[in-house]
């Protein structure tokens, strides 16, 4: 067991490791991922049109947590990393998101880089918890340990994915917003929902590459 843990700690990933694994996971879960994107975008657009202020974010936030949990649970099951009969960890997962998100937001409020770094160190925490391996504190600790040597590579991978997505989304929203505000709002929500879903599955990719007994999705379906 100790030798497995040491092997995980010493492993260092790069974007060239993470992106192919993420691509395989997205392909294997494409239907569910697209449903999450469409559903979250629709909820947020509708909520924004019938309410204002913080209340308008509440339906999307709740829907996001539910979609996040069940999407990564499905992806982990397809990878063979979550066994049948694993207890439902939804409420623990909610608590984990609140705790890690609050601390990461403090980092982002101080400086952008610390927030990105904290997010990278805890990128796999949700997958650790949902797979049934640990409780909330232990999941955060295990993710922190696993991702240490790869933290900046995880940040770099996020930037490689999100910067082009956000630039395209903002450009389209700006062009469409002049004549069709509703369409512009819809495009914006689709972009943000896509970024969220990719982020969730990237956490699964990082976990699947760094956990003891690492396996690549391509090997499972070979």
Give short role names for the model-derived ranges.
Residues 2-10, 59-81, 121-134, 153-222:
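Juxtamembrane transition segments at transmembrane-helix termini in multipass membrane proteins
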Residues 10-42, 86-106, 120-170:
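Interfacial aromatic "cap" segments that immediately flank transmembrane helices
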Residues 36, 40, 56, 60, ...:
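Alpha-helical transmembrane segments of multi-pass integral membrane proteins
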Residues 45-55:
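Short, hydrophobic transmembrane alpha-helix segments
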Residues 52-54, 81-89:
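Extended interaction regions within the primary functional domain
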């Amino acid at each position: 067991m100790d030798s497995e843990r040491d092997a995980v700690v010493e492993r260092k990933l790069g974007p060239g490791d993470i992106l192919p694994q993420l691509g395989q996971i997205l392909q294997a879960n494409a239907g569910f991922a697209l449903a999450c994107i469409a559903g979250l975008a629709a909820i947020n657009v509708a909520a924004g049109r019938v309410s204002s202020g913080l209340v308008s974010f509440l339906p999307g936030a709740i829907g996001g947590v539910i979609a996040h949990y069940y999407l990564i649970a499905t992806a982990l099951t397809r990878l063979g990393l979550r066994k049948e009969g694993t207890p439902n960890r939804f409420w623990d997962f909610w608590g984990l998101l609140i705790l890690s998100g609050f601390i990461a937001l403090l980092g982002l409020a101080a400086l952008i880089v610390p927030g990105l770094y904290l997010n990278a160190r805890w990128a796999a925490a949700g997958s650790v918890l949902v797979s049934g391996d640990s409780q909330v504190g232990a999941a955060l600790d295990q993710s922190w340990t696993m991702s240490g040597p790869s933290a900046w590579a995880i940040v770099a991978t996020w930037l490689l994915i999100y910067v082009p997505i956000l630039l395209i989304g903002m450009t389209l929203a700006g062009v469409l917003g002049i004549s069709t505000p509703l369409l512009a709002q819809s495009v914006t929500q689709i972009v943000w929902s896509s970024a969220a879903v990719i982020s969730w599955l990237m956490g699964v990719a990082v976990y699947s590459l760094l956990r003891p007994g690492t396996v690549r999705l391509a090997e499972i379906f070979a």
